[in-house]
UniProtKB/Swiss-Prot annotation:
Residues linked to a lipid group, S-diacylglycerol cysteine type: 29
SUPFAM superfamilies for the chain: YVTN repeat-like/Quinoprotein amine dehydrogenase
Lipidation, N-palmitoyl cysteine type: 29
One protein family per Pfam: Germane
Name of the protein: Lipoprotein LpqB
Biological source species: Rhodococcus jostii (strain RHA1)
Protein keywords: Cell membrane, Lipoprotein, Membrane, Palmitate, Signal
Location of this chain's protein in the cell: Cell membrane
Signal peptide: 1-28
Top-rank lineage group of the source organism: Bacteria
Gene Ontology cellular component list: plasma membrane
């Protein structure tokens, strides 16, 4: 290990959930360097999965043959043909590989019975997820156990009895499958929203797979909250090719891509822009480069782009764009709001810069409005907290009071503020743009409050379609759904930071498909979590002093507050130079970083 880098051994509850450069083996935990960059759990294999899976090795002992079978099961091509080679002919014909796909780690193969030509083994493992149709990863936690029997046929062991469905070893799964996002539209049609999927196959098959999934539409939980311009009978005519019509190495390297759609209804220029944005960002973020030549029934999809589109043509809907670069970093310092620059801090004009009793605050996406939770100073049983709302450089008004109010969070269009009050009620504060008048309406959060007693954090994603929450120290993601009557609900909450090991203290959105979580642990206090719960990566802990009590993030930078200062972590720094740096003016004082959102 290089100087200046120490290893932190993960607790048993976290091992297998937080993984960096070194994979967790089936028998133990990995040692994590503090200053390494986040890595995917596993190395993406760009080759076709089938090319790396061999036929059963001759003379293999039954327990080793089972491990080879699990490895082969990660190749789904031809109805898991690679795995069927390990079965007896009769069982191969009956095996229902499509029944389920269970993802496990720490697989133990334990002998049950053994004779000269028969053997039965108990398979025990930690269950970490399910892979559902359409490549949907569902994070789960629990134990897995099943029995598999083998018999000797022609001098070779083959599986003679096994459960329906496939068992996927996590490390092998992550070597074979790739996580890619489909992009749908937010309700207002202002940005694209990710829907992560896990796909398998060579890179030259990727475009066809992703466009097919995009046409099939969003997952059921997300469907009420997004739009899909590729629905209603849209299909692809003929093969997807390179931009010049070549059919080899499509989506690999340069040369662009050409897709001819059928069934596209009449569209105005704006609808065509949205349609193209879905296609382009889905392909671009899967490392399939343009130009993107889009056709409809053999003719240019949009006459403005006969030679193809580029990401610049749909840049306004870039899912990785951030407003924080223009608004800048702010902080809550000793109860007051300050603007932060490279040279220091400056109190902002108006109420928010002069008040000394604020506990948390949030800036609107455009930086023009502020919402803050202030200490009322009144003794119990009077409300201890007040939600204050006002313009950035102006006064503020109290819109509601409560015993406890979470850090506010702004809707993307700056029209509403969300917060949880007293741990079990979620509200929206609506603000009229012209008059500044406010009204408070409840959000249907029954699906969330059923998960636990107390909501301590609520953060809306920058596209406004998801909400990240901490409930009783656990991390959940819910879908923000507008109901037919106009009211809002938090629906389909799912635990995503399974195996976190310590209670979550704070969280924020880094990208539209990644959140950053501060947890109550000294060894690895900050982690990144994928929205589908498929991965959890440790961020460096060098220079941090636990506990980390607050986190705010953008697509380029994470900010945290520990027990003595505010620190920043630049995602663009080289791996060897990536560590937390103190923010000038926010050292040795009680301060919390604040970015728009």
């Amino acid at each position: 290990m290089t100087p200046g880098r120490r290893s932190a051994l993960l607790s048993r509850s976290v091992c297998g959930a937080i993984v960096l450069a070194v994979l967790v083996t089936v028998s133990g935990c990995a040692s994590l360097p503090d200053s390494s960059t986040p890595q995917a759990i596993g190395t993406i294999n760009r080759d076709s999965p089938g090319s790396s899976v061999a036929a059963p090795a001759p003379g293999r002992e039954p327990d080793l043959l089972l491990r080879d079978f699990f490895k082969a099961s990660t190749d789904p091509s031809n109805r898991h043909l690679a795995a069927r080679q390990f079965l007896t002919p009769g069982v191969s014909g009956r095996w229902d590989d499509a029944a389920s796909a269970t993802i496990v780690d720490k697989v133990d193969v334990l002998p049950e019975t053994r004779s000269a030509d028969q053997a039965t083994y108990t398979i025990r493992a930690n269950k970490v997820g399910q892979l559902e149709p359409g490549g949907l990863y569902v994070a789960e936690e629990g134990s897995f156990e099943t029995k598999i029997s083998l018999e000797l046929q022609g001098g070779e062991w083959r599986i003679s009895e096994l459960p329906a469905g496939v068992i996927l070893d996590r490390a092998q799964f992550l070597n074979t499958y790739q996580r890619k996002s489909l992009y749908f539209l937010d309700p207002a049609g202002t940005t694209v929203v990710p829907d992560p999927r896990w796909v398998s196959g060579a890179q030259d098959q990727m475009a066809s797979q992703l466009i097919g999934l995009l046409i099939d539409g969003p997952k059921a939980a997300l469907a009420p909250a997004v739009r899909n311009e590729l629905g209603d009978g849209v299909s692809v005519r003929g093969p997807i090719t390179k931009a010049d019509g070549r059919t080899a190495q499509v989506g690999v390297g340069l040369g662009g891509i050409r897709i001819d759609f059928a069934g596209v209804p009449p569209m105005d220029a704006q609808a065509k822009q949205l349609f193209a944005a879905q296609v382009i960002w889905t392909l671009a973020n899967a490392e399939i480069s343009g130009p993107y030549v889009l056709l409809a029934d053999g003719e240019p999809f949009d006459e403005r782009f006969p030679n193809g589109w580029t990401t610049a043509d749909v840049a306004s809907m870039n899912p990785f764009a951030t407003s924080s670069a223009t608004v800048g970093l702010h902080a809550l310092r000793e109860g007051s709001m300050v603007s932060v620059t490279e040279t220091g801090v400056t109190p902002v004009p108006g109420y928010f810069g002069s008040a000394r009793n604020m506990r948390s605050l949030a800036l609107s996406q455009d930086g023009k409005l502020v919402a803050a939770v202030a200490d009322t100073g009144r003794p119990a049983p009077e409300p201890a907290s007040s939600l204050m709302v006002g313009a950035y450089e102006d006064g503020a008004a109290s819109v509601l009071e409560g015993g406890a109010i979470t850090r506010p969070t702004w809707a993307p269009d700056n029209s509403a503020i969300w917060a949880a009050v007293n741990g079990n009620t979620v509200i929206r504060v609506l603000r009229e743009p012209g008059t500044g008048r406010t009204s408070v309406v409840n959000v249907d959060a029954g699906a969330v409050t059923a998960l636990g007693a107390t909501i301590t954090e609520l953060r809306l994603s920058r596209d406004g379609v998801r909400a990240a929450l901490i409930v009783d120290g656990k991390v959940y993601l819910a879908i923000v759904t507008q109901m037919p009557g106009g009211e809002y609900a938090l629906t389909n909450p799912r635990a995503v930071a399974i195996g976190l090991g310590s209670p979550a203290l704070s969280l924020d959105w880094s990208t539209s498909d990644t959140i950053v979580v501060a947890r109550a642990a000294s060894d690895i206090p900050v982690v990144q979590v994928a929205v589908d719960g498929s991965r959890m990566d440790a961020l460096p802990s060098r220079n941090l002093t636990a506990p980390v009590v607050a986190v705010d993030a953008s697509t380029t930078t994470e900010f945290v507050a520990d027990s003595r200062a505010v620190f920043q972590l630049n995602n663009n720094d080289p791996a060897g130079d990536r560590y937390w740096r103190e923010v000038p003016g926010l050292t040795g004082v009680k301060a919390i970083p604040v970015l728009p959102g």
